[in-house]
Amino acid sequence: ALNRAAREMDADSIATGHCLDDESQSVVMNYLRGDVTRATASFNSNSAELFIPRIKPLCRSSERATVAYGLCNNLLVPLPECPYTRYALRKDVRTWLGKLEYAKPGTLTRIADGQEELLSRMPKSEVVTELGRCEKCGEPTANRLCAACQQLERLM
């Protein structure tokens, strides 16, 4: 869905709002799940002509700083919390990393730096994942179905 909308707008890239907290949580969650592929994945945007590359301009800004900026500039839209959050691994990881960051400032940055260092030391052939096409909608994906079609399939 994002790719399609970005193509319709003739966009060069899609900027996401992922902040340092999100990035660090994802790194830890991938390792806790034993998902080495996702932990080390990077997509070759040349492998799918429909893929619009993602950029993360806030990935080195803390969630606290990002929210403060949004509040000061009237940019935040109140969003209800997902009722299933309490069951998600991310909630536990977020709480744990928040406590670590409070006790040992810089923890989140060190996690993100460590992940970048790990990726920089890996051979490109080990890191880059070729994108294919979703079997249902034809959008770029590293899986049989894209995330949107997976969600639709779960709902039906």
Write out the residue ranges for each language-model feature.
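Active-site adenylate/phosphate-handling loop in enzymes that bind or generate adenylated species
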Residues: A1-A65, N143, A148-M156
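Mid-to-C-terminal catalytic subdomains of enzymes
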Residues: D21, S61-D113
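Short alpha-helical scaffolding segments that buttress acidic/His motifs in well-ordered protein cores
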Residues: V27-V28, I111, Q115
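Thr-Gly-centered strand-to-loop micro-motif
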Residues: I55-P57, L79-P80, C134
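Short active-site-adjacent structural elements
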Residues: R86-L89, S120, N143-R144
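Short, flexible, mixed-charge glycine/proline-rich loop motifs
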Residues: L119-E130, K136-T141
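Short cysteine-rich clusters marking metal-coordination/redox-active sites
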Residues: R133-C137, C146-C149
